Amino acid sequence: MKIYLVGGAVRDSLLNLPIKDKDYLVVGATPEQMLQLGYRQVGKDFPVFLHPKNQQEYALARTERKIGLGYGGFSCHASPDVTLEQDLLRRDLTINAIAQDEKGNLYDPFNGIEDLNARLLRHVSDAFVEDPLRILRVARFAARFHALGFHIAAETLALMRQISASDELNALTAERVWQEVDKSLGGPHPEVFFEVLHQCGALEVLFPEIFALFGVPQPEKWHPEIDTGVHTLMVLAQAALLTDDKSVRFAALVHDLGKALSPKEHLPKHHGHGQKGLPLIKALCTRLRVPNETRDLALLVSDQHQNVHQAFELRAETIVKIFDKADFWRKPERLTQLILACIADMRGRTGFENNPYPQGEYLTQCFLAANNVDIAAIIAAGFQGAEIKQALNLRRIEAVSQFKQKMQTKLPTDEQ
């Protein structure tokens, strides 16, 4: 029985990156032997065991055979006669197919170290096409290691296009797709994840609402990049620079979906695109089973981002109505999230990347003024029942109005 450290831990160690999880491969052992040594079996489809002391995962060496559609359509064969190289052969990328024994010796039958040094994401074998999930994984690795200069090998990208052209992607479960999206949204370059999916044809299959934005023109005055799809990924990149909040990043990604529905005769203008996008966001979130809080913020940003951009032009009554509709009184953090998404939208344009966004501070101060209205004073004044809500609304409007009068700096309307 031989034990090897495999996968991400070896890869990240060679890249001098922090190691998060350690996965071990056991060659030459049976499930019975593992149980006798005190390991606890947790794998259902193939033998994976937890170490009796540190609870790290130890998997028996195995081979896989394609028997059906999707990433789950495999028959696994685990036995003591499966070699290290046979196990590494089934892995997705060469950089993930490097093993290290207990003495620190490296085993690299598919030249993963060479590809690491060349900053190349390359498939191990043509069996790559058998697992559609690998498209999402490669896109995620491309995003994760983008800052290190990694790129996808041309022959691997060709196989990814082959998968996209088949029915395999449709076999992926919503939960698995969202899991990969969620991981990518948490990384430093989520826009690269979607760029790769667009390059290989998977975006059209898995995210048709986002794919539809590419090729849709916008006014060059406000959008020198012109293409709405390009703008969308620029906004996502800006959101990633502004915040680690994955919900804000997702909202940035889908805030302009309605532009794909703009009548051709009206292009490059997109009147009411925020509201037009709401059904598209709902459909996408339902299909992928996006968490409710993430969905709700995305709907809010789509619905209100144009108002936020034009905040200086809004009447006090309109501002308070927006606060009411979004229920910022009970969820003030939502205002911060909305403003962050709007900053990303404003900066996600060629030449606007470093511009200030005074609308954000302005709306924040409007909210603070409105939120400082004392409900107790209204009740003490003798208002009852529905009168309390009406009086509260009027006083909030008055508070915002007074703040607006103090403000002298106004920006011209900036159509996003």
From Swiss-Prot:
Listed CDD domains: HDc, NT_ClassII-CCAase
InterPro entries the record matches: CCA_bact, HD/PDEase_dom, HD_domain, NT_sf, PolA_pol_head_dom, PolyA_RNA-bd, tRNA_CCA-adding_enzyme
Binding residues annotated for ATP, in chain numbering: G8, R11, R91, R137, R140
SUPFAM superfamilies, sorted: Nucleotidyltransferase, Poly A polymerase C-terminal region-like
Single GO biological process annotation from the record: RNA repair
Binding site for Mg(2+): D21, D23
Subunit structure as annotated in this protein's UniProt entry: Monomer. Can also form homodimers and oligomers.
The protein's name in its UniProt record: Multifunctional CCA protein
